[in-house]
Swiss-Prot record:
The protein's Enzyme Commission number: 2.4.2.17
Regulation acting on activity, per entry: Feedback inhibited by histidine.
Protein task: Catalyzes the condensation of ATP and 5-phosphoribose 1-diphosphate to form N'-(5'-phosphoribosyl)-ATP (PR-ATP). Has a crucial role in the pathway because the rate of histidine biosynthesis seems to be controlled primarily by regulation of HisG enzymatic activity.
Recorded name of the encoding gene: hisG
Cofactor field: Mg(2+)
Top EC category: transferase
GO molecular function: ATP binding; ATP phosphoribosyltransferase activity; magnesium ion binding
Name of the protein this chain belongs to: ATP phosphoribosyltransferase
Catalytic activity: 1-(5-phospho-beta-D-ribosyl)-ATP + diphosphate = 5-phospho-alpha-D-ribose 1-diphosphate + ATP
Subcellular location: Cytoplasm
Amino acid sequence: MKIRIAVPSKGRISEPAIRLLENAGVGLKDTVNRKLFSKTQHPQIEVMFSRAADIPEFVADGAADLGITGYDLIVERGSDVEILEDLKYGRASLVLAAPEDSTIRGPEDIPRGAVIATEFPGITENYLREHGIDAEVVELTGSTEIAPFIGVADLITDLSSTGTTLRMNHLRVIDTILESSVKLIANRESYATKSGIIEELRTGIRGVIDAEGKRLVMLNIDRKNLDRVRALMPGMTGPTVSEVLSDNGVVAVHAVVDEKEVFNLINRLKAVGARDILVVPIERIIP
């Protein structure tokens, strides 16, 4: 039984999605010629490239069994899909922003009849209804941040990762509407009828995500100092300890640690007598 996964053809979430699939063992067979459909290293999995904004609807309609796209686009489309995984990248906030010199400090200050420019009219209109705000929504397809300065709108809603673009354009966030990141989604019928292969891929993807920012630290230590090493290397469920057959009184210790802790950890390990220390990248962690 085959499945098709829709992946963004371009944009900031495209290459990370392709890289994630590759690391999960589902790399593209043809990495040079980007076509609409591409076979992968897995004989039962095919990739379909499309606009990120169209992926929620393609998955909901069954044109693709799975999809990788932003949560903001899923909500904007209102697509009936199963969200399987948060892929831990592409994080951004959909914010309501006004010019720095505006008297609007919060949603309660928005005057009746104000105009809001956005690429997300559905989410914006829902927000206005929830807050009882009588405002007009104007849909734009880009350069939303200039709308207040050319007389098109009084405010905007736009995606922001760091806030830098808003500040550069003299805009100030007055409210956060939605937190977004990239999701793995599934067609509901496909998830029921093709659960075997879908769960196989899901496990591979989750293993890659769980391994990000982790390193396997391996070392040798005299048994008499083992407890001191254990205190420094708790690992995921405790360090793995095994005998070193060629050297009496020495044991090997393995543990998974956060990458950001490695630098300081090595110095502390050496201080308690650890030697032959190896730090190894981890491709996947499968619980």
